[in-house]
């Protein structure tokens, strides 16, 4: 028993063959563990046994690295396409196939439709077209040549129904997803403008407040699933769900996107008259329905005249959809102009504003535009009406509204809001061919924020020509919280007047050349 005991004693008394250099060794700990106390050594092991020291060293080396967060795959930058692939992609894209129809071309899918897309069209498109009253023949047979917009209806109508369904691989494809979102981005402003024009002509004495309530009651997001079900389209939007049993957050967003996109496609292919037909005939909307009436409010007595065509009877949607201006009409939209500018405005001809301020305003805005009229008297009459419309645009409600409710810019402001929304939406669609609808909607909202609209008017120093009531003149001129919203309203009223008198091209000219909404023109130093 002697030698083993001596060996053990020698082992414990001799120094260890390696040293730890604990003072000079730097150990980098990347994270702190919850419990760093090492497990207790067995009682039979002495404090400086090699096995214990090795175990402690191994534990100290075991540093817990923090969990790395990798970016999602959609944010990882891809290498740019080489020239050949980029050229091939652009040449095969349907978006660049139509030179004569740039807006419609920008809403076509960015890549040719796949076999899965064609399968869906073969199975369900006939049902959708029948529900809205369209011929069942393929749209490629309509018209002659690619310049006929109706020939592309099948593709756009297919995209309108492809709301993003996480369980469907087909709706997650980029060309389908972006094509659908671009259509609903356009369709929402088409609907707003359609109802705006309809209600302004149907209710010639009403202020815009009740009209907005009527529009919300007809196409608010809560009622859109009901309209889809009324037209028997709910089975195409929700093929596997019962619409009545779905909760709101699952039912309303897809219904809203599909409803808007349908009207985006119809507007691109058939124009605004077809939008009215589908709204009131296929979906069965009734503006006289009890649920669509505005809340009761104190009405100001309107003693002023309205145009003769509004006095006889209340206009229907067929009157608005079928209306074509006569060949020698003064304006691009004569009936809309007469619905917004009351005949009594002629009493303001020759007043101080007409003599002093109107020429400066017209010079700043580039009015009157050169027109090729057959008779010089038509040009003269148009310029007189344009001057009265401009005076109405600058007429603040505080001046005459209490005695004469329509002698202010409110109705022109309402139509101006809607037309500037649509013009900016069309501009963004043609400018950003690859952008999805959500990105376009955000850019649209940021560009047309109310505070910017008024700022562009103030940049041209036109705010000095606004006609306020005597009681509020000082308050508005020295308080920007009151003044700036009124300059925004005047800006939008100018767009409404430009649309009524000269049409949509003049709204584009005002927005992008005169007021430079996109802020791309060089500024004077």
Swiss-Prot record:
SMART domains named among the record's database cross-references: RIBOc
Deletion phenotype, per the entry, is:
Pale green, albino, and albino stunted seedling phenotypes. Lack of plastid ribosomes.
- Per the database record, which ranges form the RNase III domain? 125-271, 403-503
GO molecular-function annotation terms?
A: double-stranded RNA binding; ribonuclease III activity; single-stranded RNA binding
| Entry's Gene Ontology cellular component terms | chloroplast stroma; nucleus; ribonucleoprotein complex
Coiled-coil regions listed: none
Q: Which InterPro entries match?
A: RNase_III_dom, RNase_III_sf
Q: Which Gene3D superfamilies match?
A: Ribonuclease III domain
Top-level taxon of origin: Eukaryota
tRNA processing among keywords: no
Main localization (coarse): plastid
Q: Give the matching Pfam families.
A: Ribonuclease_3
Q: Which keywords does the record carry?
A: Chloroplast, mRNA processing, mRNA splicing, Plastid, Repeat, Ribonucleoprotein, RNA-binding, Transit peptide
Q: Which SUPFAM superfamilies match?
A: RNase III domain-like
* Described purpose of this protein according to its UniProt entry: Binds specific group II introns in chloroplasts and facilitates their splicing. Acts on both subgroup IIA and subgroup IIB introns. The substrates of the subgroup II also require the CRM domain proteins CAF1 or CAF2. Binds both single-stranded and double-stranded RNA non-specifically, but lacks endonuclease activity. Required for plastid ribosome biogenesis.
Q: What is the designated name of this protein?
A: Ribonuclease III domain-containing protein RNC1, chloroplastic
| Native organism | Zea mays (Maize)
- Write the gene name: RNC1
